[in-house]
């Protein structure tokens, strides 16, 4: 934004293009003509100035209550066996973030859960605004930048609108006299293009897939479940869509705690028989474990050390693990490992979704440390598939290398502990031909 001077005419056109929410919306024809008239840099700077000055409403994804209800019913009726594959029936190479885990998938893998994001609206309906306000160490959240950032911070986020995510291309065109020039063609300015740009320029807290939570509750035949980090309510949503009957959990964030009440009320109205839910507003280190009944599966994705800054600047910030345990050894020894031990002590199974955090270039081996602490209960790990996309075709020497990369299955780790005589994939295991003919001969 160096040497920037507001173009009053352009700024006025942005004002005129906005509705009650103050968000400028330009259709393709208008967007192209304004790019041609003012140039992309002038457009970008004035748009950044406009957002910083007028503070339009942040363009959240539109999710109606009908969308949420349809998503819930679809998730409830979905057979999660379809997304669970035992290791011996996985036919592609599995790729972990780190290749030197002491308990790697190659040696200790049990199988895969390949859950789609299809059902994310079931919880995102309640939580997306809070999730988009949650930043990380060194990275601001999109909603926070939009609402509080200066023009330069916003300008940095807007660049992708003119760089491909918006179908904008620098195209050679000829005028009526045959003179050739390059123009920016394609694209538009709407809610989707704004949020797509801000996704690339900021940090967005991860949403856990409710369908994966349901799969884990189903594969363990769980009736009572424990979640020591309720987070964005995604595992709560998976619980309501599963056959489980009682959910116990905790979270120190007062903002999400209020939303859990809304989730519980809405979901129970969609069921013929209401489910029992008890959630404490506290950190997992302060959970009254003695008040819990016997738990079938404790499944959580704990707050990684120094990663997401939940409820920063809000009420009870001091109760968050990132604030309360601000050194790795304290986080590990006073929070992470004791919580895992206490959860295992009251549960038949313990499933923990965590990867080693890396802060300022230093990797902390949280995964191996967890397994070493609970080694006598360790079953192995389940790979939770994530979608991996290469940053640039320039990373690959040829199309074959790119195809090989894209053909791998990238995973996050779910570390599993509990009953060693239980086959977690028994309901999704496909019989081979030998087993089929052996059964036919009986």
Language-model segments: what does each one mean?
Residues 1-84, 92-93, 100-113, 131, ...:
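Class I S-adenosyl-L-methionine-dependent methyltransferase catalytic core
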Residues 95-98, 115-122, 126, 131:
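OB-fold ssDNA-binding interfaces and closely related basic DNA-contact patches used
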């Amino acid at each position: 934004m160096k040497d920037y001077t507001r173009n009053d005419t352009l700024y006025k056109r942005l004002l005129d293009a906005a509705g009650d929410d103050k968000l400028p919306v330009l259709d393709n024809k208008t967007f192209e003509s304004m790019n041609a008239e003012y140039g992309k840099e002038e457009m970008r700077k004035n748009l950044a100035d406009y957002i910083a000055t007028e503070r339009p409403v942040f363009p959240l994804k539109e999710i109606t209550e009908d969308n949420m209800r349809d998503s819930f019913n679809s998730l409830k009726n979905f057979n999660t066996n379809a997304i669970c594959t035992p290791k011996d029936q996985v036919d592609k190479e599995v790729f972990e973030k780190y290749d030197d885990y002491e308990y790697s998938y190659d040696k200790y893998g049990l199988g895969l859960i390949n859950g789609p994001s299809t059902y994310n609206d079931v919880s995102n309906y309640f939580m997306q605004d809070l999730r988009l306000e949650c930043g990380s160490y060194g990275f601001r959240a999109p909603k926070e930048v939009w609402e509080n950032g200066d023009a330069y911070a916003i300008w940095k986020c807007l660049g992708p609108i003119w760089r491909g995510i918006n179908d904008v291309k620098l195209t050679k065109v000829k005028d009526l006299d045959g003179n050739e020039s390059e123009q920016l063609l394609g694209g538009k300015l709407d809610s989707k293009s704004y949020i797509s740009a801000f996704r690339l320029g900021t940090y967005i807290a991860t949403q856990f897939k409710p369908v994966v939570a349901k799969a884990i509750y189903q594969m363990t035949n769980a009736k009572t479940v424990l979640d020591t980090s309720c987070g964005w309510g995604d595992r709560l949503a998976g619980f309501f869509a599963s056959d489980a009957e009682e959910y116990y959990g905790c979270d120190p964030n007062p903002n999400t705690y209020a939303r859990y009440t809304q989730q519980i009320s809405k979901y129970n109205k969609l069921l013929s028989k209401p489910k029992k839910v008890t959630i404490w507003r506290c950190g997992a280190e302060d959970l009254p474990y003695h008040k819990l009944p016997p738990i079938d599966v404790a499944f959580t994705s704990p707050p990684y050390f120094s990663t997401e800054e939940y409820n920063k600047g809000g009420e009870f910030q001091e109760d968050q693990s990132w604030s309360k345990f601000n050194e790795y050894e304290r986080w590990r020894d006073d929070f992470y490992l004791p919580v895992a031990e206490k959860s295992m002590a009251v549960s038949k199974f313990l499933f923990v979704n965590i990867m080693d955090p890396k802060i300022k270039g230093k990797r902390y081996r949280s995964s191996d440390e967890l397994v070493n602490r609970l080694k006598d209960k360790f079953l192995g790990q389940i790979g939770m598939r994530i979608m991996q996309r290469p940053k640039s075709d320039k990373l690959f020497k040829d199309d074959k290398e790119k195809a090989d990369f894209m053909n791998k299955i990238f995973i996050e780790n779910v570390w599993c502990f509990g009953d060693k005589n239980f086959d977690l994939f028994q309901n999704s295991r496909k019989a081979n031909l030998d087993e089929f003919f052996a059964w036919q001969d009986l």
